[in-house]
């Protein structure tokens, strides 16, 4: 769906749209890499619920931005926003750890992984079908689903991190390269 939208917005051929789409995917991935530790740290400070809801709402707004995008720059901005909001998977993982017993945690993470897998299979198929109606239609539908998800979460999603278990925001914990320090403790995982 995105390549067709890039073609339309950027007035480029499919080959150039594929290259631009690759750069947009890189921008999305870089945003996730940079913001995942920050989101996790903010969730440790303010709780899981507000950041999950903010990310879901942000994703809905991002899909609207993508649907309305008049330029390639808007599409790039949209992919970066999607990466930032998408980095909330780290908060969802923490939420699962908060609300499940240790013996049930592997099952809960397995269900979360399965849900991601189903989404990666069904999402593009549905997006492709909706794309037949126009390259912006899938983004409008995704925005509606995200915003409905936000409303549902607003009324149903509990806070999983008690105030006494929260900790101050620490910039060093929000460093995306901090994970590499962990690898130094396990030299067997390094090439």
Q: Which residues does each PLM region occupy?
A:
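Conserved MFS/SLC helix-loop-helix module at the cytosolic interface between two early adjacent transmembrane helices
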Residues: 33-70
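Helix-loop-helix hairpin linking two adjacent transmembrane segments in secondary transporters
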Residues: 115-155
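Short hydrophobic/alpha-helical segments at membrane-entry points of transmembrane helices
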Residues: 71-79, 191
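Residue-level signature of mid-helix packing/kink "hotspots" within the transmembrane helices
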Residues: 29-37, 87, 120-121
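Cytoplasmic helix-loop-helix junction between adjacent transmembrane helices
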Residues: 78-117
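MFS-fold secondary transporters
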Residues: 62-66, 82, 153
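Extracellular/periplasmic helix-loop-helix junction of adjacent transmembrane segments
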Residues: 3-32
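Juxtamembrane intracellular "pre-TM" segments in multi-pass secondary transporters
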Residues: 158-191
